[in-house]
Design a protein with these regions (language model features):
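Short, well-formed alpha-helical segments that are part of the catalytic scaffolds
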Residues: 22-36
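Catalytic binding pocket for nucleotide-activated donors in carbohydrate/polymer assembly enzymes
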Residues: 629-630, 730-734, 761-842
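A conserved acidic beta->alpha catalytic loop
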Residues: 49-58, 80, 101
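Active-site and donor-binding regions of nucleotide-sugar-utilizing enzymes
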Residues: 374-375, 475-481, 486-645, 668
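Conserved catalytic-core segment of nucleotide-activated headgroup transferases in glycan assembly
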Residues: 265, 271, 498-518, 639-730, ...
Length: 898
């Protein structure tokens, strides 16, 4: 820009920001703009207040008074981000305009870096800046944006028509030529919401220009704030129906259709961008929690109709080669085949698992339409699979693909589908790539590497990576005395930090009735359950994390737990020095009623215990989301049900003196598990501000509930979920409410004492029903939780149709149901008693026995254990210490193994 232009008051940059109720972030935004090292006389800020109801306007006007030459503030009625930005654009005078969001920040040299690049590359049509993720809660900056690859290699100008893996669609982190926007009458389209209005404008702008020349300026760093309360437009968009209709129709589809009409084919960079956008629709569903989706009913139907049309504009080779962000093969198969209304199947089958004990191999392949005609040729003969199922692969309310799963005998094997043999592979092959980019070619076709003179470690050795403790454990675990004690051991555990669940009940059964089994129980030393079990005389209780635990785990053949968390199934301390060879039995913590398939499918579960026919069918049957078949899944009942039945029979109707209120947790209440732990900590101030705390405390403090309990002669008890118990001591509970914890009480006795049980979604209700006690469900957040807001998705169980008691949606309704139940007495109403009987037709006290037999049966006739090569004894000081410890360990193990 010439000095003459500057003297005339022209601006190089216009920063347009649409402001709506972001007062808590505005000071950071203002400070970031004020801190720019670029001449302020070349910059203007146009802040459009979009009808804010907080103090945003007051803050902006104060800024305008302080910086009148920089800041212009205008206001309008609330109409959305697009209309606010468009208003600002009409007022802009800058050569280049950007649309910085008011809850984000820019680094001090942001404008300077962009200006330097533009002076060097004046042919640039669009500038994209580098988005750095800002954690709102911690303030930590992380360079982990999914498109950070676009900024590798320094600041570059890319012709994205020639380099179609590059694109840019974020208007706040982009700079546009104002004259081009005006020439082509380009503005934000308010019909494209709640998201993608940025990408829609960026793409139309690039399609309108003579060249698609995008400058990727990595040194201009834009701090994108990820809000801790998940309240940003992007973070909340998945719960908005327009995300699944208007965005596809007015955004993706209009771009593809318009560009195809002009040139006969949508540009490849645009196809890549749309595939990138579509990938988030899939990944949002592939979460353990099963993210909420508004794509249900009519919205789901329209979403899939639009997606089907979108796929007609996407080239097969572009879909197949897409790797700009991780893209599961199944997502690509859906885009390629699910919407074409013609049968299809993989031209191969994978063999993802082998069970040597049962002599079976697992085969799987995906298909669309009807199941192909199958011929499993084993040892030269056509055989039927020992176990088989069809798994449905569904997204946003529609089954799009199927996976065929079959277990067949482990012999020479061939599979024919519709009369043609298919490849058998250990894993799915990559898609054929018909176009290679220069960088790919350089990586794939390299000149021969020079031979390194650096000595390489011996193949397969792990000793240099092991601590001396792990080296000692690795050596001791292979010695004869240790193997005599722990060889072929069955390790049982509930949580790391507590017991008193199905694993403990099965352990007790084994020690009393199956002494031939080398059974051990694991729990953290010093916990109440550790002290209790040791006080009862159980010497075979091993402290989690101890050397003894490591030796036990290195030699066990069965790991049996009521929990399937990684610290239980794949403990890092064991993986550090040993390769597990155990079979894993999942006893479960309760009866599964929701769809937990995304969480459980990746886990290596050899035996999966279920308790009801509905639960079994929902996991092992056809046309559900689980990857488990009749091979792994068995209907036995939970081991803890045996003792529960005994306890239930101890307390007659006159002895049931408790209204037990026991809600489950919510995944947004607590932080993630720490590595190697099963404990979670909650901030009390954050907890009390939640709807969860407000509703449950309102129920516990209800005067009507207190009066009803007093009239019925019962006590109100509160038993929060273990993940929430850390706040129990700080809750201001009324004096008539008695607080219980899982650590300090026999919870089965609490269940048995209950005249009434109140919960929200907890599977504890199945325990209560098992002993014929009444239940009330309090589901104030049912729309959120049941549509994927918590762990899992809606499953086969419908609380109104299948539940064991009435369902309330607010505090008053819950109190009314509780009062009615107390008037009726401590037994379920007839309609719910009938459901209980249908759910549990067999209650015979033999669940432990059935589980034991299934573990024996699933292990097969052959021993799972493979001969272990002895670990060389440590040398030097470590060796002397090890030999001394070995003598001590042998004496200790002889006593402990009794």
């Amino acid at each position: 820009m010439s000095q003459q232009s500057i003297r005339e008051g022209a601006k190089r940059f216009s920063i347009i920001t649409a402001v709506y109720n972001v007062a808590r972030y505005l000071e950071d935004f203002i400070a970031a703009v004020d801190a720019q090292d670029y001449p302020s006389e070349l910059v203007e800020v146009i802040a459009v207040n979009d009808g804010s109801t907080d103090t945003s306007l007051e803050i902006l006007e104060g800024w305008q008074r302080r910086r009148p030459g920089l800041v212009t503030v205008v206001s309008k009625e609330n109409g959305g981000q697009s209309t606010a930005r468009n208003m600002g654009l009409e007022l802009a005078r800058g050569e280049w305009v950007t649309f910085t969001d008011p809850d984000d920040m820019i680094e001090p040299d942001y404008l300077s870096e962009v200006d330097t690049f533009l002076r060097a590359k004046p042919q640039t049509q669009l500038v994209g800046t580098n988005r750095i993720m800002l954690n709102d809660q911690t303030g930590v900056l992380t360079d982990n944006h999914p498109l950070r690859m676009h900024f590798r290699g320094g600041n570059r100008l890319r012709n994205i028509d020639e380099l179609p893996r590059f694109f840019h669609g974020t208007a706040p982190a982009a700079f546009f030529r104002r004259d081009l926007l005006n020439e082509h009458q380009l503005r934000f389209d308010p019909r494209v919401r709640p998201n993608f209005e940025d990408g829609h404008l960026c793409c139309r702008y690039l399609l309108a220009g003579a060249t698609a020349a995008v400058g990727f300026v990595g040194t201009a760093r834009y701090h994108y704030r990820k809000r801790g309360d998940a309240s940003s437009t992007l973070q909340t968009s998945l719960t908005n129906p327009d995300r699944y209709t208007a965005v596809l129709r007015n955004g993706y589809l209009s771009l593809l259709r318009d560009s195809s009409e002009k040139t006969g084919r949508a540009p490849e960079w645009l196809q890549n961008y749309i595939i990138y956008e579509l990938s988030w629709y899939f990944s949002s569903q592939d979460t353990h929690a099963g993210a909420m989706t508004a794509a249900q009913g009519a919205v789901s139907e329209e979403f899939h109709e639009l997606l089907a049309e979108i796929t007609t504009y996407l080239d097969d080779d572009v879909i197949a080669a897409f790797d700009i962000r991780p893209m599961k093969r199944v997502w690509k198969e859906i885009l390629l085949h699910a919407y074409r209304n013609e049968p299809w199947h993989n031209p191969f089958a994978v063999m993802p698992a082998l069970d040597q004990q049962q002599g079976l191999v697992k085969l799987s392949y995906n298909f669309v339409g009807d199941l192909p005609v199958e011929e499993f040729v084993v040892g030269g003969k056509v055989v039927a699979p020992r176990h088989a199922k069809i798994r449905d692969i569904s997204y946003h309310g529609r089954t799009l693909l199927h996976e065929r799963i079959a277990w067949v005998p482990l012999r020479s094997l061939r599979l024919r589908l519709n009369g043609r043999a298919v490849d058998l592979r250990a894993s799915a092959p990559g898609f054929p790539v018909t176009t290679r980019q220069v960088g790919d070619i350089r990586r794939l076709v390299r000149p021969p590497a020079r031979r390194s003179t650096k000595p390489r470690p011996a193949r397969g050795t792990t000793e240099p990576r092991l601590s001396w403790e792990d080296r000692l454990a690795a050596w001791l675990s292979t010695t004869a005395p240790v193997r005599r004690v722990y060889g072929d051991a069955w390790v049982l555990m509930d949580r790391i930090h507590d017991a008193d669940d199905s694993a403990e009940r099965l352990f007790r059964y084994l020690r009393h009735k199956r002494r031939n089994v080398n059974a051990w129980f694991v729990v953290e030393e010093g916990t109440p359950d550790w002290e209790r079990l040791r006080a009862e005389g159980y010497l075979r209780v091993v402290a989690h994390g101890s050397l003894r635990w490591k030796l036990l785990m290195a030699n066990c053949t069965q790991l049996i737990s009521s929990h399937a968390d990684v610290p239980v199934m794949r403990p890092p301390a064991i993986l550090a020095f040993a390769t597990p060879s155990w079979r894993f039995t999942f006893l479960q913590h309760g009866v599964i009623k929701d769809d937990l398939s995304e969480w459980l499918n990746p886990k290596q579960i050899d035996l999966f215990i279920t308790s009801t026919q509905q639960e079994y069918d929902s996991i092992a049957g056809d046309h559900n989301a689980y990857a488990f078949s009749s091979k792994e899944t068995k209907l036995t009942g939970l081991p803890r049900f045996d003792r529960l039945l005994e306890q239930g029979q101890r307390f007659g109707p006159e002895e049931r003196d408790l209204v037990l209120i026991a809600p489950t947790w919510r995944n947004w209440l607590v932080p993630s598990l720490a590595v190697g732990s099963q404990k979670r900590q909650i901030k009390m101030s954050d907890f009390l501000a939640t709807d969860y705390a407000r509703n449950w405390l309102a129920l516990l403090r209800s005067p009507e509930l207190a009066e009803a309990a007093e009239r019925s002669g019962v006590t109100i008890g509160f038993l929060p979920h273990p993940n929430v118990q850390s706040v129990l001591a700080e809750l201001d509970l009324p004096p008539h409410v008695r607080a219980f914890t899982y650590h300090d009480n026999d919870v089965q006795e609490l269940f048995a004492r209950s005249a009434l049980f109140v919960t929200d979604y907890s599977s504890i209700a199945f325990n209560i029903a098992y002993i014929d006690r009444p239940t009330v469900y309090f589901q104030f957040d049912g729309e959120l939780v049941l549509n994927g807001g918590h762990v899992g998705r809606r499953g086969y169980f419908d609380y109104v149709r299948d539940g064991f008691g009435p369902v309330a949606s607010d505090v008053d309704e819950a109190v009314s149901h509780i009062v009615d139940s107390l008037k009726r007495g401590p037994v379920p109403a007839p309609v719910y008693q009938q459901r209980i009987q249908q759910t549990f037709p067999l209650r015979d006290g033999k669940c432990c026995e059935r589980v034991y037999k299934e573990i024996q049966r699933s292990s097969g006739p052959a021993s799972r254990r493979q001969p272990k090569r002895a670990t060389p004894a440590p040398s030097g000081l470590v060796g002397r210490v090890a030999r001394r410890l070995r003598r001590v360990a042998v004496a200790y193990l002889k006593r402990a193994s009794r």
